[in-house]
Design a protein with these regions (language model features):
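Active-site neighborhoods and metal-handling regions in enzymes and metal-associated proteins
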Residues: 1-256
């Protein structure tokens, strides 16, 4: 059964989403050559816990050891923070984070360049952002999950890129993951219908190369099978009668 949220519940999620947006903004500012992914994870957890009522949603979830999923270059998602993973000039780092606030969850991700990146990596980032925007715009009452997926896939395929196999968006709200799934491909008017009050994570994961993926021996990190780079952007979105409401776009003010 699909869970729908009241306007009051959506407002609570938006407050958590604002904390999440601020966390990603803070993390992006810390990204630089020489920093480890573990150091970024520590910054994220400390920043989240500095906001009353907020805590990292991913830490310990299904046994995940970090607070943030931090994935580099060909790593698509679920990279485990490590003191041995050091960012280098030209890397693409994906920062994927969830917040639990007053018992409600939000989920968001960004891709950040480490210093100067090559033109194709920049194009990958731009296309993935555009695909997310197209998916969000399709998250309207009366549409279906297939409309979101079709909108994302149209942007990605036009650029000559692919969406990662078997990795999809999902319901988020009273729990961090659930149904309906929100694939990054689809046929308009197919899949579960979007109703007012539905809250979902829309998250295109886009590869320069082929769509095939594999999981590393750590049983968490998912990478492109051909070693090509991947980008990831994600928002938590509420479907409302007034149109899609992005809950993770506007950060709370950050103290100097």
């Amino acid at each position: 059964m699909i869970s729908l949220k009241s306007p009051r519940e959506i407002d609570i999620m938006a407050r958590g989403g604002a904390i999440l947006a601020a966390t990603l903004e803070r993390l992006a500012a810390e990204v630089r050559p020489g920093i480890t992914t573990k150091a970024l994870d520590v910054v994220a957890e400390e920043f989240i816990r500095s906001h009353q009522g907020a805590k990292p949603a991913f830490k310990g979830l299904y046994g995940f050891p970090g607070s943030a999923c931090i994935s580099i270059n060909e790593e698509i998602v679920h990279g485990i923070p490590s003191p041995k993973r050091v960012l280098k000039e030209g890397d693409l780092v994906k920062l994927d984070f969830g917040v639990e606030f007053e018992r409600y969850f939000t989920d968001s991700a960004i891709t950040v360049p480490v210093g100067h990146i090559d033109a194709e990596s920049q194009r990958l980032m731009d296309v993935t952002k555009a695909a997310l925007a197209a998916g969000v715009d399709a998250a309207r009452v009366g549409n279906h999950t297939g409309d979101i997926g079709a909108a994302i896939a149209s942007v990605v395929s036009a650029a000559g890129f692919t969406t990662a196999d078997d990795l999809v968006g999902h319901y988020v709200g009273s729990k961090p993951h659930g149904d309906p799934q929100v694939p990054n491909y689809g046929i308009p008017k197919r899949g579960p219908k979007l109703l007012a009050g539905l809250t979902i994570a829309i998250e295109p994961m886009v590869n320069i190369g082929k769509s095939a993926t594999r999981t590393l021996k750590d049983k968490w990190t998912i990478v492109t099978q051909d070693g090509s780079r991947s980008a990831h952007f994600e928002h938590t979105v509420a479907v409302t009668e007034a149109g899609p409401r992005v809950l993770t776009a506007t950060p709370v003010p950050v103290a100097p």
